[in-house]
Structure formats: C-alpha cells, structure tokens
Amino acid sequence: MRVPRLRRTLLTLGGLVLLWMLFSIPMDGPAAVVNPHKQQFGWDEDSLWFQLERRFRELRPRGCDPGATADIAAALASSQRLVRTVDSRAWNPDAAVFASLEANIFALGPMIGACPQRLGDYIRLVTQTRSAVKRQSQRWDVNQAATRDRMYRLLFGGRAALEEVMLQDSLGSRPALALAEDEPSQTPFTRILGVTIHSGDLLVSRGGGQISALIAVGNDYAGNFSHVAMVYVDEKTSLASVIESRPKSGVAVHPLEDYLADVKLRVMVLRLRADLPALRADPLLPHKAAMIALAAARTRRIPYNLEMDLHDTTHMYCSQVPSSAYDKLGIHLWMGMSTISAPGIISWLSAMGVRHFESEEPSDLEYDPQVRVVAEWRDPETLFMDHVDNVVTEAMLRDAQHNQELTYPWYMLPLGRLVKLYSVTVYALGFSGPIPQDMSADAALHVLSFNAIHTTIKRRVLARAVEFRHEHGYIAPEWDLLHFATRSTGHDLTIGGYLAALREQL
C-alpha cells in the first residue's frame, strides 16, 4: 500500500515541478522601442566638484569670522548685480553673463556651507536666478540644445548647489518652504502649508521609492522630480482636490490633504503665466482645464500608460493628466520635450514595459517658459536620502550603459505570474492589485529586481557615508556619495535585497 502512495506523491511533486518549470518559460518577445537619438547631458566637472569640497574644508575652521562674513557679503552682492544685469535686457542663452552667474553660485556654496548664517540670502539668490532665467527663456527656443543646457545648468545646478549647502547646515536653520513668484490668478484658490494654491496649478513632486528616483534621474537631463498632479479647487467650498495618475490605480481624484500625506520628498508648485494670450482672453482657463481633468477622472476608468505613449490618451501616465486637459484649451505644456536616449537605460526601461522614450517628464516641466514657479517645499529630514537615492540610481544606470543586463532569477517567474493573476482578479472587482493593470509579470519582476539592487547598493552607500562623516566631520557631498555607489555596484544581489524590495512592493 505504501508504494502506490509514494508513487502518487512523487508523481504529484514531479508534476508540480514540471508545471513550475513550464511557468518559468518567458513569453515576452523582444520589445519594439523608439529611441529619440538625442544627446545625454553631462556635466564633466568632476575636478570642479572636488575643488569646491576642498574649498569648503579650508573655510570650515573660519566659520563666520569677520573676514569670512565680509567675503560672503561681497560675493552675494556681486551675484545680485549679475541677476539685475540678466533682468535688464534680452540675452541669448550663450551670453557670458549666465556663465558668470553660474560660477558665482557654485563659488558661494562652500562659503555659505562654512557659514550658514547667510543661508537665507543664498536661497533668495538661487530663487531669483531661476526666475530671471525663466523670464529670459520666454524669448528662447527651448528645444535648442544650447537653450536646454543653459537653463539646466542654472536651474538644476543652482538647486544642487543650494541643497549641498542645506545638508551641511550646522545651525539646523534650513527652511522647508521657499516662496518664489506669486503669479496672479483669478481662479478659485485655497491656502495650505503657507502657500496659496489656485485651481489649475501643477504640483511637481518626488516620491520616496526607487522607481521615483529612476523617473527623476533616468532621462537625458537628470532631474529632481518624478510625478505631476493637477489641482482643482471648488469655487463654492474652496475645497481642493488633486487629479493624478499612478501606476497601480490609474487616474484618480484625491483630497489635497491625502495627496500631501503620501510620501513626498519635495513638492514644487507651478502656475501658468497670467500674461499668456490664452489667459488674457480667459483668466479662468486653468480652472476650466482642471474641470476637464476632474470630469475625465470621474466618468471613466483610465489605466496608467506604462508604455509612455504620448499619443495614447485612453491610458495616461502622470504628465498626461494636465497636458491633455490644457491641450484641449489650446495650451501645449512641455514646450521642450523630454527624451531618454542612452541605449543601456532604454534596455532597462523597456524590460519594465516602457516603449516610448520621447515624452513629458515631470522634471522638465520646470523649464517650460509658460509656467512660473510659485513655491518649492523640501522635507529637510529626508533631503539626504533623496540625494542617496539619486546617486545609487545614477550608478546603476552607468552599469546599464556598460551593457549590464537587468535580470531576475528564472524561478521567480511562476510566482510573478500567480501574483499577476491575483492582480487581474482584484482589478476586475474594482480594486488595485500589486502589479499594475497593463504590466506583465515579467516587467513587474524586472521592476522588483531594480528595487532589490537599489536597496542593496543603498545600504552599502549609507554605511560608507557614516564612516565618511566620522572621518571628516561633515556630510558626504553628492559626488562622494556617487563614488561610494559606483564602487558598490557589480556585486551579487542578496536574497535580503529581494525580500526587502518585495516587502515594499506588496
């Protein structure tokens, strides 16, 4: 009697193993992708970054002594004169005044880092520089490489310099909120966290996940933001809602308070310029655009556009929500299109389900001359982690450029397909599953693998950053963190990294 029972058990186990192996056979063929073949921006300024760090080390012992204070005052005054010069007339993007202003902002970084008492003035300088450059850009062709490079160096570069200083702030005085331009608007409004928010405003943010870092860093002009949402303010109640698209839920409407309660490392408020011809003709146009987005979200289910196809509005990624709404009213946002051109990065993203690499990236909306920056909020407590996530992602993408494939263990595919089946079932019931609606199990496992590798490298970088601070007495700047991350890649992925990523995914 025992032999037949043993035989049945062995046959059952053998059948299960065979079935598991059959489910481990990949079904997806090679992805058809569209490469825009643009040039990826590169700073190529490593010597400058380490020179600035050496200068900071030299200035730290002086702190805010009278000589240092006088030097800072003179440098700030010189920079403010340059900002006024920029605002005094029309300039071409290649004008020398912009290079001088960029050099001044970077040179001030070590000085303010060593004497943070003037941090508030440095924040105002960087904010005023951004506003002046954006005013100049109203006359520029933002699709020209020279224009994109100039705006990027001053806006992204200025923010990077400022945040390095903020991280070294020994006084703990770095403010979370930096107000910029109070662009006039006639649409309904509300106030939250010290900022007046109008209907039709755009909220550009950075999430706390690994994929958020990939979205921010992965395009031809690496950025700071990973998500865009649109604000609707009810004209009767002044209650604000946010219309946004997320990978698992698609397009949805949330109260503004719920939006802010979700993990946000930074948020920037953008508003259309009041002097745009379309807004002069109809000052309520932004509110009408918000109403269009709100109606679309409430009347039909719009899944997330995983392929990033700009022309498919039956599915929408986050940027398409405001873009499509404003487009219906004659406002075409993202005057400068975003591109991802590096073959290695394209290979990784295509493994995650992306098929189109010319799109509307959240970070690039800041460079659109049609919008003003109203305010920028950073979480001071997570700013360092934001930078760590960036350098880990950048190091991983450098591996991608050296033909390092993004893979996962073959035996995980059956499990991924079971989770996908569960996700399809709960989507049919009107709920969100762990795998987005249009994402395959194979793509989901590539995402999980990216998250797991990121988690493993990040752990090593953080350990090295602690050693650096103990050794040098200050927080490792981003270029040092990137060095740590680069040295931490290429190791075998640990099961602990997979489990940590899986917990976050579920």
Please place each PLM-identified region on the residue numbering.
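Cysteine-nucleophile amide-bond enzymes
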Residues: R2-L506
